[in-house]
Amino acid sequence: MKKTYRVKREKDFQAIFKDGKSTANRKFVIYHLNRGQDHFRVGISVGKKIGNAVTRNAVKRKIRHVIMALGHQLKSEDFVVIARKGVESLEYQELQQNLHHVLKLAQLLEKGFESEEKH
């Protein structure tokens, strides 16, 4: 994922948490904030309660892969994806479905893409 598509600075994370809206399902929480940019930016957070470092990094890679696959469908907003406990045991397909579901709930998918079948 290119650096321009990442939320990296603590200040940006805090602004999204403070001023953004949140949406959740059983496996993910998403905070999002529209800042008027021309593309989306994403930050991924996987807490220490979820496995060891290897497991957390694997979860982050899977989330990043799903986000990039959905990239053309995402609205131009900043958002932070927080993984909840239990996400580490999901297969890729289940993780993709859960993430797609919470993005749809947060209305972060462009019109016309929400009704598309999941891969």
From Swiss-Prot:
One of its GO terms (molecular function) is tRNA binding. Keywords: Endonuclease, Hydrolase, Nuclease, RNA-binding, tRNA processing. The gene is rnpA. Consists of a catalytic RNA component (M1 or rnpB) and a protein subunit. Its EC number is 3.1.26.5. This is Ribonuclease P protein component. One of its GO terms (biological process) is tRNA 5'-leader removal. It is an enzyme of class 3 (hydrolase). It comes from the Bacteria.
